[in-house]
């Protein structure tokens, strides 16, 4: 048994569209960032240097003073907010006490606070770790010498802990203890800590102005993480392809929820989205090549991106999307309806595809698709590099499709391209393609056309008002006009009737006189007739 499978290229008629210069250059899956998840990340700013404590005490003390200058203002703002946000356990008194979840803010103690700061303060209160969890976290970090570690709490929540300078201490300083003097080790660690402090200042500097509502991007946080951003994202469960999209869309954000001055660490609440692929939706990218009709250069106006799902075709707004490795990842829904005329255009009815003049802007003169060159050789120089012959395009042709059977090595617009076997027809003749209506996209042209249309509408309005006045005049004089017409008609009919009566009367009299007149030579035969009958005669 042989099963024949027919491969459907999609709902878009690429063959017909290619005749008017529309080429599909790329197709991507459609993914949306759904509701964000939250993960705690602890950034330990002071490395564990118990092995080399004697050599680095002075450098660590100086570094600690610098850290306090950054951490103390942030800690004061966080403490002020968390102390003045309390849980609202109940309302009312007695047996009929109503209980519900919520928080209440002591506005008098806070003083001036914006709506964003109050909202961030409530979120800070709800996401803040309790004192017991902080104490357990501090003890775990003091015993850890790993650059990246996972700390499991009693509630089974996993906290990712990062020690920014610990890798340098473990891999550079400790192995060099036998080869370098104690003073040199202290100097090297001091330089590293000073550099790390400048990175911290660049990351958390904005938080000094507004520690409550300030957000930190994961890109900025990567400096404080010691360049371990990929490992952190892998801990959050992102794949390699998704990782690039998440970073480009700045989907991962972090907020400071706690500062521990004694342990010298910061607790960050990281918000990261979940990617969800919309099955069946394919996003297509369209490119337009200009074509010539006589001396005028045109191109077809189509959206840059469209999406297909089954038989449906819709518009696609790429402003909130990032395109990476066969995927379009968007921070919101980017699909919206498409007009029926544009759908007919994409399904192959070229008469429904609008076109506009290439004026003042440089459009695509050629494009490489499926190994073939689709070019408007009437507006640019197309030359076969192998034979040094010019590839001409006659005026009755819209486009020229160049493949290896025409020329294997093509020089076009100063670029030399090696083409493959033929995938498109040789040429497209203007007489065989039904072109769509011409429109203007330039702002000045659109404004001029709109002004002309408005003027024509005003002129038409004046003419309509004049015609209405004429119709009103005719309507008012309808009875007098009818009377004037009926009067001569009635007189004429009366005269004709009298004339007919006279003619008929004369004709009747003439016939009657002929029927009663007796000829004088006529003598009746009265033989055998009685005298009385003769007398009667």
From Swiss-Prot:
Segments on the Cytoplasmic face: 505-537
Residue ranges, annotated region (Fusion peptide): 100-124
Disulfide bond sites: 321-330, 345-353, 377-382, 384-407
Subcellular localization, as worded in the UniProt entry: Virion membrane; Host cell membrane
Signal peptide: 1-10
UniProt GO BP: fusion of virus membrane with host plasma membrane; symbiont entry into host cell
Entry's Gene Ontology cellular component terms: host cell plasma membrane; membrane; viral envelope; virion membrane
Positions annotated as glycosylated: 16, 48, 54
SUPFAM superfamilies attached to this UniProt entry: Head and neck region of the ectodomain of NDV fusion glycoprotein (SSF69922), Virus ectodomain (SSF58069)
Protein name: Fusion glycoprotein F0
Species for this entry: Phocine distemper virus (PDV)
Species classification: Viruses, Riboviria, Orthornavirae, Negarnaviricota, Haploviricotina
């Amino acid at each position: 048994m042989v099963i024949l499978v027919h491969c459907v290229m999609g709902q878009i008629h690429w063959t017909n569209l290619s005749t008017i210069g529309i080429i599909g250059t790329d197709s991507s899956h459609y993914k949306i960032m759904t509701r964000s998840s939250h993960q705690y990340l602890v950034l330990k700013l002071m490395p564990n240097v118990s092995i080399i404590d004697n050599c680095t005490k002075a450098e660590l003390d100086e570094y600690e003073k610098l850290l306090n200058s950054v951490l103390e203002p942030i800690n004061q703002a966080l403490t002020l907010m968390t102390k003045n946000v309390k849980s609202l356990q109940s309302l009312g008194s007695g047996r009929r006490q109503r209980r519900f979840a919520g928080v209440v803010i002591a506005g008098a103690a806070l003083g001036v606070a914006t709506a964003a700061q109050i909202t961030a303060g409530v979120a800070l209160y709800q996401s803040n770790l309790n004192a017991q969890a902080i104490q357990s976290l501090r003890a775990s970090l003091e015993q850890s010498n790993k650059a990246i570690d996972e700390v499991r709490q009693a509630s089974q929540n996993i906290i990712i802990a990062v020690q920014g300078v610990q890798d340098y201490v473990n891999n550079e300083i400790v192995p060099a203890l036998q080869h370098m003097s104690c003073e040199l080790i202290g100097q090297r660690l001091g330089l590293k800590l000073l550099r790390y402090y400048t990175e911290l200042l660049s990351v958390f500097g904005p938080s000094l102005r507004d520690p409550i509502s300030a957000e930190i991007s994961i890109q900025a946080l990567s400096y404080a993480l010691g360049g371990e951003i990929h490992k952190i994202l892998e801990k959050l469960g992102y794949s390699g392809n998704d990782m690039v999209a998440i970073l480009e869309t700045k989907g991962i954000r972090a907020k400071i929820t706690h500062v521990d001055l004694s342990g010298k660490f910061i607790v960050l609440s990281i918000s990261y989205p979940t990617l969800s692929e919309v099955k069946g939706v394919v996003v297509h990218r369209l490119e337009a090549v200009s074509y010539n009709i006589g001396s005028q250069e045109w191109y077809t106006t189509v959206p840059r991106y469209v999406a297909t799902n089954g038989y449906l075709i819709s518009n696609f707004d790429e402003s909130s999307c990032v395109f990476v490795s066969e995927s379009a990842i968007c921070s919101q829904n980017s699909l919206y309806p498409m007009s029926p005329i544009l759908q007919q255009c994409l399904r192959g009815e070229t008469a429904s595809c609008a076109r506009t003049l290439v004026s003042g802007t440089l459009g695509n003169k050629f494009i490489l698709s499926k190994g073939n060159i689709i070019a408007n050789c009437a507006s640019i120089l197309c030359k076969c590099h192998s034979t040094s012959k010019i590839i001409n395009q006659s005026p009755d042709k819209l486009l020229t499709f160049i493949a290896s059977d025409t020329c294997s090595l093509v020089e076009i617009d100063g670029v030399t391209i090696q083409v493959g076997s033929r995938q498109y027809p040789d040429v497209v003749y203007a007489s065989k393609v039904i072109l769509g209506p011409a429109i203007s996209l330039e702002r000045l042209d659109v404004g001029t056309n709109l002004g002309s249309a408005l003027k024509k509408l005003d002129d038409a309005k004046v003419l309509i008002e004049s015609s209405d006045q004429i119709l009103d005049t005719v309507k008012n004089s309808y009875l007098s006009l009818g009377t004037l017409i009926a009067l001569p008609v009635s007189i004429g009919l009366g005269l004709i009737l009298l004339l007919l009566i006279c003619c008929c009367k004369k004709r009747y009299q003439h016939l009657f006189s002929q029927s009663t007149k007796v000829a004088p030579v006529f003598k009746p035969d009265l033989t055998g007739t009685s005298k009385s009958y003769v007398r009667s005669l």
